[in-house]
Design a protein with these regions (language model features):
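Active-site acidic-Proline motif in GNAT/NAT acetyltransferases
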Residues: 78-80, 84, 112
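Conserved catalytic-core motifs of GNAT/GCN5-like acyltransferases
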Residues: 8, 107-110, 118, 122-123, ...
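Acetyl-CoA-dependent GNAT
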Residues: 1-73, 78-80, 91-93, 97, ...
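Short coil/turn segments at alpha/beta junctions that flank glycine-rich nucleotide-binding fingerprints
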Residues: 68, 84, 100-104
Length: 162
C-alpha cells in the first residue's frame, strides 16, 4: 500500500470524499451533520490518499488550526479495506505531515453515530477533549486530540484532556 499526497481536487480523492458523505448521511439520517464550513482546497494544507493495488482506498486531510496545531479532516477508508491497517497508515502519515509543518498537536471531530471511529481513535492514542471551534454545542460531535511532541525516548506523548 502507498500513501500519496494529492491535490484536494484529485478525482479519486473527490470520489472517496463523496463515498464518505453518502455513508455519513445514512448513519445520521440527514446531510446536516457537520458544524461549520466543510474543508476546501483553500483551507486544506495536506490531502493524502491511500492506494492499494492501484486503487484509491482511503483518504485524510489536515487543516491548520493555529501555529502549533492542525485538525484531521475527511479521514475515510472504503468499507472493504477496513481492518487491514489502511486507517492506521493514513493516520500515522497525517501525524508525520503535521510534525513536518511544526504542528505538534492534532485534533479531530468524529460523531456519536460512528462507534467504530470512536474506538479507532482511542486505540490509536487519542484522548477525548471538550468540543472546540465550530463543534461547540453540537450534540452529534465527539472531539479528540493527540500531542505529537516526542518525549525523551522518541515516542509520542499523549496529552491528557483539558
Amino acid at each position: 500500500m502507498l500513501i500519496e499526497t494529492r491535490r484536494w481536487d484529485d478525482p479519486e480523492g473527490a470520489e472517496l470524499r463523496r463515498q464518505q458523505r453518502v455513508e455519513l448521511d445514512a448513519r445520521y439520517g440527514s446531510s446536516d451533520h457537520e458544524p461549520g464550513p466543510p474543508p476546501s482546497a483553500a483551507d486544506t494544507d495536506v490531502f493524502l490518499v491511500a492506494v492499494s493495488d492501484g486503487k484509491a482506498v482511503g483518504c485524510g486531510a489536515l487543516r491548520q488550526l493555529d501555529s502549533g496545531s492542525a485538525e484531521i479532516k475527511r479521514m475515510y477508508v472504503v468499507p472493504q479495506m477496513r481492518g487491514t491497517g489502511v486507517a492506521t497508515s493514513l493516520l500515522r502519515a497525517l501525524e508525520a505531515a503535521a510534525v513536518e509543518r511544526g504542528w505538534h498537536t492534532v485534533r479531530l471531530e468524529t460523531g456519536t453515530a460512528q462507534p467504530d471511529a470512536l474506538r479507532f481513535y482511542r486505540r490509536e492514542g487519542y484522548r477525548e477533549i471538550p468540543l472546540f471551534g465550530n463543534y461547540i454545542g453540537s450534540t452529534l460531535s465527539v472531539c479528540f486530540e493527540r500531542d505529537l511532541t516526542p518525549d525523551r525516548t522518541g515516542s509520542r506523548c499523549e496529552r491528557s484532556p483539558r
